[in-house]
From Swiss-Prot:
It catalyses: Endonucleolytic cleavage to 5'-phosphomonoester. Belongs to the IIV-6 142R family. One of its GO terms (biological process) is RNA processing. Keywords: Endonuclease, Hydrolase, Nuclease, RNA-binding. It is an enzyme of class 3 (hydrolase). Residues 250-319 form the DRBM domain. This is Putative ribonuclease 3. SUPFAM superfamilies: dsRNA-binding domain-like, RNase III domain-like. GO terms for molecular function: ribonuclease III activity; RNA binding. Its EC number is 3.1.26.3.
Length: 333
């Protein structure tokens, strides 16, 4: 049985009220969403501001002093326990600890008393050490003009941020570095590198300043720091190997230099951001001067992606008969 019901027509006023109600609800939802997003952004800014202003202070208790003693003991000063104790007490005491504190404090934690002075000293000392110790470790390089390039590469690799920060982290320096929370979050490698250089600088400075002039000798501070650096760098010393000392981009450039009439003056890189395995990475492709594709590589950093692409390009060129003649001094070592 079919039943028909005739609903009365909705009045225009009621329609308008319903429409207005829907509009209000819609705007309330938008306002709520905007408020939610605003609060999220606001909270993130507050958190970042707190990180920018909140300072982490590394411990300066006995653990800090014990760390310094461990470093100074590597210099092997004193043949007896008494001599060693006198050596340590001379350079690690209430008078010198403020200098060590500065060496482990970044400018983000203290604009005035920070590691920048000692970092400058340590940077020059480490650079000199790497050059001289390279000629000491590899006597076959001495007096050879072509060795300049090899030692320069050694200095670049051993004195790099990656290497110095690794040495510092392996020594356990991170916990003692004072800096803002943001700096510690974003600049860990830089802080480790800088403070390692500052540690070397302040060590040399303190030995120079606090050695009794009646017993001191010219260059004593550097001699002791040199012996310290020999031990600190020993696990990281590189062999004289072309593929180890020269990064892939420079090795690829060397191939182009040798075959520039056929390959062009230099490799051409094209890089773009892509999503790979749900991560943003760089995809770098490399071509010769004639537009021929040689290889590609991906990495989080553009520089690393180009290095990976260069490795592939070198293999491609070798398979096509373009192999660089390695300098003879590398081959004899």
């Amino acid at each position: 049985m079919l039943v028909c019901t005739n609903r009365p027509p909705v009045s225009p006023v009621l329609q308008l009220c319903r429409f207005a109600s829907n509009v209000v609800l819609f705007h309330l939802k938008i306002v709520k969403q905007i408020k939610f997003e605003f609060l999220n952004v606001f909270n993130l800014k507050i958190k970042r501001l707190q990180m920018e202003t909140e300072v982490y202070y590394g411990p300066r208790d006995d653990s800090f002093k014990d760390f310094l003693i461990k470093i100074f003991k590597l210099m092997d000063m004193g043949s007896t326990r008494s001599e060693t104790s006198n050596f340590l007490n001379t350079y690690i005491n209430e008078e010198t600890l403020p200098y060590f504190n500065m060496a482990f404090t970044s400018s983000s934690a203290n604009e005035l008393n920070n590691y920048e002075l000692f970092e400058q000293m340590g940077d020059s000392t480490i650079g000199k050490f790497i050059v001289w110790s390279s000629y000491e470790k590899f006597p076959q390089l001495r007096g050879k003009p072509e060795a300049v390039e090899i030692v320069a590469r050694m200095k670049i690799n051993l004195g790099s941020k990656d290497n110095l920060s690794q040495i510092a982290e392996d020594l356990g320096m991170w916990t003692f570095i004072s800096a803002t929370e943001e700096a510690r979050h974003r600049l860990k490698k830089k802080l480790l590198e800088d403070v390692f250089e500052a540690l070397i600088g302040v060590t040399e400075y303190i030995i120079y300043e606090f050695t009794d002039t009646n017993y001191s000798q010219p260059g004593l501070a550097y001699q002791l720091v040199y012996s310290l650096l020999l031990k600190l760098f020993d696990p990281y010393i590189l062999k004289i190997d072309y593929n180890t000392l020269v990064d892939s981009k420079n090795r690829l450039k060397g191939v182009f230099d040798q075959y520039k009439d056929k390959l062009g003056l230099q490799p051409v890189y094209q890089s773009e951001r892509i999503v790979k395995n749900d991560k943003n990475v760089f995809l770098s492709k490399v071509y010769d001067g004639n537009g021929n594709f040689l290889g590609e590589g991906t990495a989080p950093l553009k520089k690393e992606a180009e290095k990976k692409a260069s490795e592939v390009a070198i293999l491609t060129l070798i398979s096509n008969g373009y192999k660089k003649n390695i300098p003879s001094l590398y081959e004899t070592l």
